[in-house]
Amino acid sequence: MADKKGSNSEKLLYCSFCGKSQHEVKKLIAGPSVFICDECIDLCNEIIRDEAAGAGIEAGLSKSDLPSPQEIREILDQYVIGQERAKKILAVAVYNHYKRLKHLDKKDEIELSKSNILLIGPTGSGKTLLAQTLARLLNVPFVIADATTLTEAGYVGEDVENIIQKLLQNCNYEVDKAQRGIVYIDEIDKISRKSDNPSITRDVSGEGVQQALLKLVEGTMASVPPQGGRKHPNQDFIQVDTTNILFICGGAFDGLEKVIVDRTEKTGIGFGASVKSKQDRDAGEVLREVEPEDLIKFGLIPELIGRLPVVATLGKLDEVALMKILVEPKNALVKQYHKLFNMERVELEIRPAALQAVARKAIRRKTGARGLRSILEQALLDVMYDLPQMKGISKVIIDDNVIDGDGKPLLIYEDAPKVAGSN
C-alpha cells in the first residue's frame, strides 16, 4: 500500500502503516519500498516512551548501579539551591530505602525497617521540590497529598486511602510499581492535635487523621476502588501493600521553634551553660535542635513520630540564595522566561539589580522561592501581552524599577539602536 495511481495518472504515495495519502499528512518518509507518515512516527515515539518509562521503574530499583548518596546529592544540587544538610540527610535515607528494597528477596535474619522522612521548614524553602526531584531521579511513581483535605473514614472529605488511589493512577494502576513509589504528604503540621487535653468532641481532621495515616505509613493493605470509582460494598477492590512505599511528610511547623527554645532554655540553666539570646539564633538554627518531644508538644502523636525516624530541617532562604534560585538550577525561572521570549525571537535581559529586587520582594512577602514566579509574572505581564502584536523588537530589558512597579520594560528595536518604553 505504498503507492497508487490517481485519476490524473499522478502517482500518489501512501503511508504503509495507517494508509493515509501524502496529501492527508504533513510529511511522508520513504524507506526501502515502504513509507511512514509523521503521525505514525509520533505514535511510535509515544509507545516507546511509555514502555521505556515503565521498564525504567523496574530497572531503576533492581539494577546494581542504584545512585550512591553522593550522586543523589549532586543531582539534587542541580535543582535545589542551598539546604545542604537536608539534601545530605535525604540522599542517605532514600539510598538506604531502595537498597533495602533490592535485598527484600534475600533471606536474612536481620530485617531492615523502613525509614520514612519528615521535612520541617518554612514555606517556599524547597520541601516539595526535593521530594519531586528524588522521584524523578529514581523514576518511580510519585504523588503529592495535602494533609489539610484529609478526614477520618466516614466523614466528609478525603479518605487517607485516596492517596494510594492517586499513586495508582500515576502508574496506570500497576500495583507492583505503586508499591515502590514515593508519597509526599504536605502540610502535615496542620493536622496536629488541637489540644493536649482529650476532648469529648471528635477531632476528625487532626488526631483522627494522624491515626489513619499511621496505618498507611507503617504498612497496611489499602483497599482502593478500581479506576477511580467510589467505594461500594459490592465491588472488588485493588489491594495495595504500603509497606515499601516511601512516605515523606513536610510542613512549616510555625511556632515549633518557640517549643524548642522553651525546652533548651530549661535544660541550659546553671554554671557553665552556654547562653545565647533568641536574637542571635535564626529559626533554621533552632529547628536543627528539634527532638521528638518537641513534635509531641506541637501536636503530633508519638506513634506517627516514631514512624518518621529521619528528620531533615530546612532553613529560610536569604536574598543571595533566592537570587541563585532565579538563575542557577536546570529549570531556573529566568531560563524559562528566556525560552518563552526566544519563541517570539526576542532576547530577554533581566539585570542583576532586577534579580535582587525580586528576591527582596519575596522576602518581604514571606513566600520564599514559591513567590518568585508570581513576582516575575507580574513584572512581565504587560510586555508578554503586547509582544506578539509588536513588530521589530529584538530585545526586552528588565531593571529593578520594573520589579518595584516604578517603571516599564525597555524595548530595543531592530531597525534603530534606540531604547523606548513599552506602551
Swiss-Prot record:
Membrane spanning residue stretches: none
Recorded hits in HAMAP family, A to Z, give: ClpX
Residues bound to Zn(2+): C15, C18, C37, C40
Query: Carries keyword DNA repair?
Result: no
List each copy of the ClpX-type ZB domain by range.
3-56
Q: Which organism is it from?
A: Paraburkholderia xenovorans (strain LB400)
UniProtKB keywords: ATP-binding, Chaperone, Metal-binding, Nucleotide-binding, Zinc
Q: What is this protein called?
A: ATP-dependent Clp protease ATP-binding subunit ClpX
Gene that specifies this protein: clpX
| Family of the protein in this entry | Belongs to the ClpX chaperone family.
- Gene Ontology BP, a term: proteolysis involved in protein catabolic process
User: Which InterPro entries does the annotation name?
Assistant: AAA+_ATPase (IPR003593), ATP-dep_Clp_protease_ClpX (IPR050052), ATPase_AAA_core (IPR003959), Clp_ATPase_C (IPR019489), Clp_protease_ATP-bd_su_ClpX (IPR004487), ClpX_bact (IPR046425), P-loop_NTPase (IPR027417), Znf_CppX_C4 (IPR010603)
Keyword match ATP-binding: yes
Look up the record and report any one GO term of the cellular component aspect. HslUV protease complex
Kindly list the positions annotated as binding ATP.
P122, T123, G124, S125, G126, K127, T128, L129
PROSITE patterns according to UniProt: CLPX_ZB (PS51902)
Highest rank taxon of the organism: Bacteria
One Pfam short name: zf-C4_ClpX
Give the record's subunit note: Component of the ClpX-ClpP complex. Forms a hexameric ring that, in the presence of ATP, binds to fourteen ClpP subunits assembled into a disk-like structure with a central cavity, resembling the structure of eukaryotic proteasomes.
Function description: ATP-dependent specificity component of the Clp protease. It directs the protease to specific substrates. Can perform chaperone functions in the absence of ClpP.
**Gene3D superfamilies, from UniProt?**
1.10.8.60, ClpX chaperone, C4-type zinc finger domain, P-loop containing nucleotide triphosphate hydrolases
What's a single GO MF annotation on this record? Answer: unfolded protein binding
